[in-house]
């Protein structure tokens, strides 16, 4: 299948012949007739003119799962975040639902014995994720379940796809594996499959496979602008891929952190191929990208406040340098202000409690 994505960047638009778009004239306001502090004086007026809101409806809680029973495993690099066995997951999710958080995202930390060169455990119909999805949808049918589509938790080398003899990730061969993984999630009952692998063409391939299999209501959240960031370290500890990846990197498929226009091309392609939502990852260091994506496309735009962002905030808070609650709320509000519709954040549960107060 061939997909056509068409858009012009703001820079390109400025060079379109006969473009009649004119810049908006600045307001003419002067002191003392205008005193900007007047509207900031009282809490009621600050609230009345607040431009951006953060509610539990904007929150998605990423959750890590492991095999076994009675497991709540702490993650040293991510304070207060745990890996859950399925029985403990059900207890934790009951609290999430009670707090009004609309969706969770599942990330597996599979046993080392289940890993392989091709990551075939990823599409095992009785795999960890697939069993978790079935159990969750049975008990919490209204909760949105998002599943990660990528091979890195399941490969012995820690890459997101299938590699050749030189360690290079093979794009088109990997697509077949991603299709099988996404279909296994949809068949288990996942509401949203979220390809985070950054292979070219994977959104179109997965969308076509879902349609052909009758999963017409399964949504796709595309990790469209996923950067080869240094902020992912604690996450890789959580899913057990750090040791597998070793000194390797993902620069041949994740985006260069220096690039901005490239993100718009990635988003345009994913939307053309059938993505329902797009994502920018990481969050706060990439708010310029969030704003550009939202302004350019107006599509549902999600942001992942990643493990490194969470770890930095928590480290500063634990040392008494920052107020944990205040910076958690501020960071998420800033992501919303940049244009995010929803945010995957490890602060979701804590912030939901704060918002309830």
Give residue spans per PLM region:
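An N-cap/entry alpha-helix motif that binds or orients negatively charged groups
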Residues: 17, 22-87
């Amino acid at each position: 299948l061939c997909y056509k994505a068409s858009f012009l960047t703001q820079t390109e638009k400025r060079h379109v012949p006969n473009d009649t778009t004119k810049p908006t004239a600045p307001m003419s306001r002067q002191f003392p007739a205008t005193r900007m502090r007047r509207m900031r004086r009282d809490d009621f007026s600050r609230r009345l003119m607040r431009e951006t809101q953060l509610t539990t409806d904007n929150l998605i809680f990423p959750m890590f799962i492991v095999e076994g029973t009675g497991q709540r495993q702490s993650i040293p690099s991510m304070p207060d975040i745990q890996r859950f066995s399925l029985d403990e997951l059900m207890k934790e999710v009951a609290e999430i639902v009670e707090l009004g958080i609309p969706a969770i995202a599942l990330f597996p930390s599979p046993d080392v014995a289940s890993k392989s060169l091709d990551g075939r455990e990823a599409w095992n119909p009785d795999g960890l994720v697939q069993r978790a999805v079935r159990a969750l949808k049975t008990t919490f049918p209204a909760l949105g379940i998002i599943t990660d589509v990528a091979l890195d938790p399941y490969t012995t080398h820690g890459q997101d796809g299938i590699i050749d003899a030189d360690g290079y990730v093979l794009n088109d061969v990997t697509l077949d594996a991603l299709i099988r993984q996404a279909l296994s999630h949809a068949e288990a009952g996942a509401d949203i499959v979220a390809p985070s692998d950054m292979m070219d063409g994977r959104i179109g391939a997965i969308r076509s496979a879902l349609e052909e299999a009758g999963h017409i209501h399964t949504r796709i959240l595309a990790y469209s602008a996923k950067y080869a960031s240094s902020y992912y370290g604690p996450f890789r500890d959580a899913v057990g891929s750090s040791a597998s990846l070793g000194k390797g990197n993902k620069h041949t498929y994740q985006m260069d952190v220096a690039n901005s226009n490239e993100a718009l091309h990635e988003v345009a392609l994913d939307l053309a191929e059938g993505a329902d939502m797009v994502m920018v990852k990481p969050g706060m260091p990439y708010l310029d990208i969030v704003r550009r994506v939202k302004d350019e496309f107006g599509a549902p735009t999600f942001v992942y406040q990643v493990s490194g962002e969470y770890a930095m905030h928590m480290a500063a808070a634990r040392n008494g340098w920052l107020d944990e609650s205040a910076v958690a709320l501020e960071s998420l509000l800033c992501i919303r202000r940049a244009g995010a519709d929803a945010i995957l954040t490890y602060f979701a549960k804590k912030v939901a409690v704060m918002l309830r107060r």
